[in-house]
């Protein structure tokens, strides 16, 4: 995935990334809600139906709540969040109308608070595919509770906690 492989690689190598389709084809604009999910018009709406999962609605809810606090659109919040990500140099927007363009450009005036960024990070945290989850726990498996180079590790739950448990 981009989140699991490309972004970490780009950050490690000092490369900039330009995310494409940061509003997921309009899904993150606030246009689609749980209440209207069954009333989406055919045509353009057909291509977004598969993205309208409970997880996505959680992101939309968070974007809408933050947008209300900033008196702006969910799209502006989503774009401000993406643009503030480490390693992101620019974003590609896909506005079809002047109103959408103005909404997207208003993201340049948004300054998100730390707690808002953390909430969006948590709401949009991707499920990474193998081997990422395995690699994330490798440090703990290798060092089994020891501190190495000043970095502490946790003892995996499968390992014995004492000599009595070993034998």
Annotate each predicted stretch with a short phrase.
Residues 2-39, 73:
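Aromatic-lined glycan-binding groove of carbohydrate-active enzymes
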Residues 12, 38-69, 84-88, 102-167:
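Terminal-tail/helix-coil boundary detector
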Residues 24-25, 84, 97-98:
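Short, solvent-exposed loop/turn segments at secondary-structure junctions
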Residues 27, 100-103:
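Phosphate- and divalent-cation-binding pockets in alpha/beta enzyme and binding domains
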Residues 58, 72, 96:
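Residue-level signal for the nucleotide or nucleotide-sugar donor/cofactor binding architecture
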Residues 77:
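Glycine/threonine-rich phosphate-binding loop and adjacent beta-strand/alpha-helix elements that clamp
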Residues 80-81:
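Hydrophobic, secondary-structure "cap" segments at the distal end of domains
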Residues 89-100:
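Glycine-rich phosphate-binding active-site loops on the catalytic face of alpha/beta enzymes
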């Amino acid at each position: 995935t981009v989140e699991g492989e490309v972004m970490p690689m780009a950050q490690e190598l000092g490369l900039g990334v330009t995310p494409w389709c940061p509003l997921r084809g309009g899904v993150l604009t606030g246009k689609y809600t749980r209440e209207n999910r069954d009333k989406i018009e055919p045509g353009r709406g057909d291509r977004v139906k598969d993205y309208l999962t409970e997880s996505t609605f959680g992101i939309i809810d968070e974007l809408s709540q933050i947008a209300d606090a900033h008196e702006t659109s969910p799209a502006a919040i989503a774009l401000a969040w993406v643009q503030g990500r480490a390693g992101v140099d620019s974003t590609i927007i896909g506005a079809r109308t002047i109103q959408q363009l103005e909404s997207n450009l208003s993201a340049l005036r948004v300054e998100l608070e730390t707690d808002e960024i953390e909430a969006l990070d948590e709401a949009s945290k991707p499920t990474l595919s193998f081997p990422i989850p395995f690699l994330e726990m490798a440090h703990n498996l290798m060092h089994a509770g020891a501190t190495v180079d000043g970095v502490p590790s946790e003892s995996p739950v499968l390992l014995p906690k004492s000599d009595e448990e070993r034998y």
